[in-house]
Every structure is written in C-alpha cells, then in structure tokens.
Amino acid sequence: MSFEQKPKVTVILANLGTPDEATVPAVRRFLKQFLSDPRVIEIPKFIWWIILNLFVLPFRPKRVAHAYASVWSTDSPMREIVFEQTQRVQAYLERENKQFDLTVLPAMTYGNPGIDAVLEKLSAHPQEHVILLPLFPQYSATSTAPLYDAFAKWIPTQRNLPGLTIIKDYYQHPMFIQALAESVLAYQEQHGKPEKLLMSFHGIPQPYADKGDPYADRCRITAKLVAEALHLKDVEWAISFQSRFGKQEWVKPYTDQLLQDWAKQGVKSVQVLSPAFSADCLETLEELAIQNAELFQQAGGGSYAYIPALNSDQAHIDLLAGLVQANLDALTHTLAHR
C-alpha cells in the first residue's frame, strides 16, 4: 500500500440474527444454527443433539414461523433495522473521518448476512483495522461471545492481519442511558404515564450466571440507571427477565409471572421497555408486545403497552457512532506516531 492511500478501516455492526423468511424451513435452518451453538446451550453435545433433532426442530419451527409471519413485512424487522443503522452510522462516520477509507457492514451471528461471510469478504481486501461493535448493550457469553469465537476462527486463516478492536458492551454508557430515558419520556408524552414501568430483559439460565456470566448484573445496572434518570420511585418500576426455554431455572424475576402478579394485585397500567435490544425483533414485537399484553389482561390487568427499542432513533445512532468514533480517534493517534 502506498503512503498516499487512506488506511482501510471496516466497522462491523453485529446482531444476533433472524431467519431468511417467515417460513417453516427457513426458521428450522435458523433455529438449528442458533441452538447448535454450545455458547447458547450448555448441555453435553450428544444429549442436546437428541433433544434438538427429535423434540425441538420437528415441532418448534412451525409455531415460531407463525409468530414471525405476524411481524414480517418485506423482510425481518431486525434485519431492516440493522441495515438502516449501518447506513446511518456509515454516513455519520464518513463525515467525521476523511482520513480513512471507511466501510460499515452489518452482520449476524446466525442467519444472513453471517459474520463468517462478512469476515471472508475482508480477506480479499486487507484492512488496516477492524472494529466490531456487537449490538448487545449488556455482554453475555450467550450473545456477544460467539462473535469473539467467529474472529478466533478467522484469525488463523489470515496472513496480513488487521488491528482489531471489539467494543465489549455499553450497558452503563451515559449516552445509552439518556437515549433510553428520552425514549420513555417521548412515549409517555403521547400515551401518558403508567402505574408501573417494567424493564424486561432477555433471560439466561441461572447456572450461566452462577458460573460467572455478568449479563444479569449488567441488566440490573442498566435498569437502575434508567430509573434514576427518570426519577422513578422504587414502587414505580421493576426489572424482569423473559423468554425462558426448557425446564432449567433462569434468572429471576420472570416477566410473565411478575405481570400476572401485578394484575392480581390490582395494577391497571403497565408500560414495558426492553433495554437489552438495540433493534426490535420477534421477541419484542410478538412476545413482549402481544403475548404478554394478553397474559396481563387475562389475569385482570388493564392498559399494557410496549415501548419500542431505540432502533434508528437519532440518539441511538449518535451513541453507536460515538462508540466507534472514540476508537477511530485512538487509531488516528496511533497511526500518526508509529
């Protein structure tokens, strides 16, 4: 590379993933890839192979495909949002970084565009530096770590390796907390303030937390900081964890049980925020917004509303781009002094 050429830098925005279509075969392929990852399911491989192939994949894809169809438009909501986030972060960073030949790419851990395929593309175009931003605000071995694994698999295949930065998470970043709080206030300005604000996060099995996964603790910190930013009293909000899978104990309290308890206690209005999600997806649009609303109301509760994820809100784009920009500033300094 000549000295006149701008250093190539690629930024990867990576989310969990989504099926290619809202069909049973596509959902089955996606679930097989996702649920075959030992980071996600920590059960002895042979035992889990039997459970997955004989009891999960023959039955679960039909129900999940039906759920996807209820939220699908021209594409998966998550993929559409991640693509828009990528375009807007690229535009932001290009304005601020004329010194780099800079590209921002979307990637998914499972499904398309897959992280392995994205890394393979980089092999054909040597990079000065790669910055990975997992779109998981709270690190977990079940979500963020598989992206580390993808890089660990790719690195030994490369001769001219780039510099590499992985932004582990941002669960208590001031811009993140402010963006969440502002999204709640904006929603409540239009729809009113509820009796209870529930911050519901995707759950993980309790044994994972017992073994050192920091996810649940980081979720609790995020929730506490958002509540403080909103000046909420302890009785006005709570934290919970959704999407239990299997018979294992998961981190508590469980979202579905808490909503039923509130309904029985006479709570008449609830709004739900899910700060673990950077983009709305099946879990937020179908489970949180629809299933849990029915659960709460059937148990005797009244008004229930889901507050959308940050998605492509300007405050969210500013946060994501700002996280990357801090690393680009450090890279600029490094390149100027080497």
Swiss-Prot record:
Annotated GO CC locations: cytoplasm
Enzyme class: lyase
Name this protein carries in UniProt: Ferrochelatase
Subcellular location: Cytoplasm
Database matches in HAMAP family: Ferrochelatase
KW Lyase (keyword) present: yes
Main function: Catalyzes the ferrous insertion into protoporphyrin IX.
Organism encoding this protein: Acinetobacter baumannii (strain ATCC 17978 / DSM 105126 / CIP 53.77 / LMG 1025 / NCDC KC755 / 5377)
Pathway(s) of this molecule: Porphyrin-containing compound metabolism; protoheme biosynthesis; protoheme from protoporphyrin-IX: step 1/1
Parts forming coiled coils: none
Catalyzed reactions per annotation: heme b + 2 H(+) = protoporphyrin IX + Fe(2+)
Binding site for Fe cation: 202, 283
GO biological process: heme biosynthetic process
Enzyme Commission numbers on file: 4.98.1.1
Family, per entry: Belongs to the ferrochelatase family.
Top-level taxonomic group: Bacteria
GO MF, any single term: metal ion binding
PROSITE patterns membership: FERROCHELATASE (PS00534)
Keyword list, A-Z: Cytoplasm, Heme biosynthesis, Iron, Lyase, Metal-binding, Porphyrin biosynthesis
Main location: cytoplasm
Keyword RNA-binding: no
